[in-house]
Amino acid sequence: MKIAMVTWEYPPRIVGGLAIHCKGLAEGLVRNGHEVDVITVGYDLPEYENINGVNVYRVRPISHPHFLTWAMFMAEEMEKKLGILGVDKYDVIHCHDWMTHFVGANLKHICRMPYVQSIHSTEIGRCGGLYSDDSKAIHAMEYLSTYESCQVITVSKSLKEEVCSIFNTPEDKVKVIYNGINPWEFDINLSWEEKINFRRSIGVQDDEKMILFVGRLTYQKGIEYLIRAMPKILERHNAKLVIAGSGDMRDYLEDLCYQLGVRHKVVFLGFVNGDTLKKLYKSADVVVIPSVYEPFGIVALEAMAAGTPVVVSSVGGLMEIIKHEVNGIWVYPKNPDSIAWGVDRVLSDWGFREYIVNNAKKDVYEKYSWDNIAKETVNVYKIAMEMMGR
């Protein structure tokens, strides 16, 4: 099968989890014997590369200060690129998130191209409502992507329910296919000495427990509530919170640390990926995912593969990945006391920690490999192709 995958981010250009998802899926499809062309953005990167068997084509849309206007320019350039490559050679086009749906919808109508849309989150879920004209416009485009596409893929059952409710999408049009990872990439060998030296290099002392947060510094990710939990955590444990991520809330969060008197116990690393991220997971004593809204939560899988216990908010897709006190811990969202309890539960009981870590690693290897997810995705492609008479 020849697949065109359209996404606004793809490694090494990483904005969030979407880039990692698209890379994992594209390479999984290639390993399953399919040919994949990725159409993405990359101003300072080559216009074409073959990365692990995936053909990556990059466009360079005109810059614009207004993100929605820029997204329109981007979609136009992506459509042009597909025209140059030859649209007719593809069996299906797979678009990711709202800003690429114009490409899929136009090619469906003009070329009768089977069009599959992946929705990784919704504007209402990300922002807690529609509070600006831009949000309303994005919401409208999300709706159009569900209406125009032949099939919709969501990354969790909870997101499917959200999509069907918000956009009135027929349930049989929406297929749930979980995110995945390559577990062996995060299950690295790190000696005790290497771990200690790495922790020292990022400001964690030998006698401190390391609490890790990985993600964007946004309201959606709930990092504020983890910081607010730190005074209570420090009552029972000598710990340091390491924050790996960037975002608009950085200044606010640093001010909050000073207000709570915990600035000396919090390290802001900024955006981290690659080997450094893998070492962070392996070196941490616990990974906390305090999200307010989380359609899936790929960070949980990465931590589970690394053999580090996870404490997660009981929201969205996280509740589908994590079973409370079996392969991780649930805590209440937006509740610092509950987060502190969850962290203490893991740090205070070594036997329990080992129990959930072993279960988590077993789950991630058995249920969340990209090769299996690619096979499920191909089944959705086939449905879309049948609908368009291919």
Swiss-Prot record:
Pfam families: Glyco_transf_4 (PF13439), Glycos_transf_1 (PF00534)
GO terms for MF: glycosyltransferase activity
Keyword Nucleotide-binding applies: no
CDD domains found in the cross-reference section: GT4_PimA-like
Enzyme class, first EC level, given as a word: transferase
InterPro entries attached to this UniProt entry: Glyco_trans_1 (IPR001296), Glyco_trans_4-like_N (IPR028098), Glycosyltransferase_grp1 (IPR050194)
Keyword terms, alphabetized: Glycosyltransferase, Transferase
Bridged cysteine pairs (disulfide): none
Source organism, top-level taxon: Archaea
EC number assigned by the record: 2.4.-.-
Family: Belongs to the glycosyltransferase group 1 family. Glycosyltransferase 4 subfamily.
Name recorded for this polypeptide: Uncharacterized glycosyltransferase MJ1607
Phylogenetic lineage: Archaea, Methanobacteriati, Methanobacteriota, Methanomada group, Methanococci
